[in-house]
Amino acid sequence: MSITAERKAQLIKDFATVEGDTGSPEVQVALLTERINNLTEHFKDHKKDNHSRRGLLAMVSSRRSLLDYLKKKDEARYSKLIGALGIRR
């Protein structure tokens, strides 16, 4: 259910703007998207897990805020990111 260390390192490597970059909006959105996708799969089996659903909504909100920030700062990076992650917007 959680992201493995290898998967997290791969996402950071794929979306980092420079070596060692873990705080850029692209990396944060990629990690949140991975966690959101994992929780979405979890809810297919555990429909009544409302405690985790609240966490999912918080993650979606956080991702939305980061995407809005990135769109405001650099539209080209925003477009590239949503294309790479397959986020519909």
Curated annotation (Swiss-Prot):
Cellular-component GO terms for this entry: cytosolic small ribosomal subunit
Q: Which UniProt keywords apply?
A: Ribonucleoprotein, Ribosomal protein, RNA-binding, rRNA-binding
InterPro entries to which the protein is assigned, alphabetical: Ribosomal_uS15 (IPR000589), Ribosomal_uS15_bac-type (IPR005290), uS15_NS1_RNA-bd_sf (IPR009068)
Query: What Pfam families does the database record attribute to this sequence?
Result: Ribosomal_S15 (PF00312)
Q: What does this protein do?
A: One of the primary rRNA binding proteins, it binds directly to 16S rRNA where it helps nucleate assembly of the platform of the 30S subunit by binding and bridging several RNA helices of the 16S rRNA. Forms an intersubunit bridge (bridge B4) with the 23S rRNA of the 50S subunit in the ribosome.
Similarity section = Belongs to the universal ribosomal protein uS15 family.
Q: How does it assemble?
A: Part of the 30S ribosomal subunit. Forms a bridge to the 50S subunit in the 70S ribosome, contacting the 23S rRNA.
According to UniProt, the name of this protein is Small ribosomal subunit protein uS15
Gene source species? Sinorhizobium fredii (strain NBRC 101917 / NGR234)
Name of the gene: rpsO
